[in-house]
Regions:
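Periplasmic-binding protein-like
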Residues: 51, 128-135, 183, 201, ...
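Acidic, polar ligand-binding/catalytic clefts
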Residues: 74, 78, 83-146, 216, ...
Length: 269
């Protein structure tokens, strides 16, 4: 009887031990410090531009986007292995377009200024520019001081606005009239609704060359400035890649070749 009782107790104890060993343990919790999935690699770059800014970026007779900056951007994108999309934007809202991530870069005669540097990352300058004064060929305006009492046209949101407003002569204008683009301002100059237009030299020289004898470019201007490519301040990776591509294009002569095709000479800085 004692043996039977002992055997029974041993059997119950072993069963309890086996039951305890077979208990399901909760699955270990996932480690909170796991590395996030890598961000997808970009295959395309979206360039924001003013599509009425010849010869930097504009539409030809076939409505195709062409221009000096267009060709530079295409060459840079090719070297980076990226598809390039050119997106016309309201140039006066360019910083909002860029920082709202609707475009990746601004590449269209973008002047480097200290104010813009607060919100935009810039490549090194690739071109020098002046804010020139264009008047009709028969105008009595011969110098900057002669703009007193005159109606002067300018592109809204352009660096010309800052350049003019910083000059004391601006206070003597009858009116500083702002336009959506330079071409429209020049058309108003032709029809007599403006006395003068202040605009980027590259645009003014290109436009006036198409209508010889119609305009005069004054010797006076509103200052010298430089063009750069702009990206978001925090997108240092893209900025570095664009700078590297531009440096290579300068070194191997590609930038000079593109410049010669548009301006007849190398004006790359």
């Amino acid at each position: 009887m004692k043996k039977l009782t002992s055997l029974l107790m041993m059997s119950l104890t072993a069963g309890a031990l086996l039951s305890g060993c077979g208990k399901n343990e909760p699955a270990p919790a996932a480690q909170s410090g796991a590395a996030p999935a890598p961000a997808p690699v970009a295959s395309k770059i979206v360039i924001g531009l003013d599509d009425n800014f010849p010869p930097m970026g504009f539409r030809n007779e076939k409505n195709e986007l062409v221009g000096f900056d267009i060709d530079l951007a295409k060459e840079a994108a090719k070297r980076l292995g990226l598809e390039v999309e050119f997106k016309p934007i309201d140039w006066s809202a360019k910083e909002a377009e860029l920082n709202g991530k609707r475009v990746d870069a601004l590449w269209n005669g973008l002047t480097i200024t200290e104010e813009r540097k607060q919100n935009i990352g810039f490549t090194a300058p690739y071109m020098e520019n002046h804010q020139i004064i264009v008047v009709p060929a028969n105008s009595t305006i011969k110098a900057k001081a002669d703009l007193a009492g005159k109606v002067v046209g300018i592109q809204d949101g352009s660096s010309a606005v800052d350049a003019v407003q910083k000059d004391a002569v601006a206070g003597s204008f009858k009116e500083l009239k702002k336009f959506g683009d330079n071409v429209t301002a020049l058309m108003d100059l032709t029809t007599g609704r403006l006395d003068a237009v202040v605009l980027d030299e590259v645009v003014g020289r290109y436009y006036t060359s198409k209508k010889p004898g119609a305009y005069t470019v004054l010797d006076d201007h509103f200052g010298t400035e430089e063009y750069g490519v702009g990206t978001r301040k925090d997108d240092t990776a893209l900025l570095g890649k664009l700078q590297k591509a531009m440096d290579e294009m300068k070194t191997d002569g590609s930038a000079a070749r593109i410049s010669s095709e548009w301006f007849g000479k190398n004006i790359i800085k």
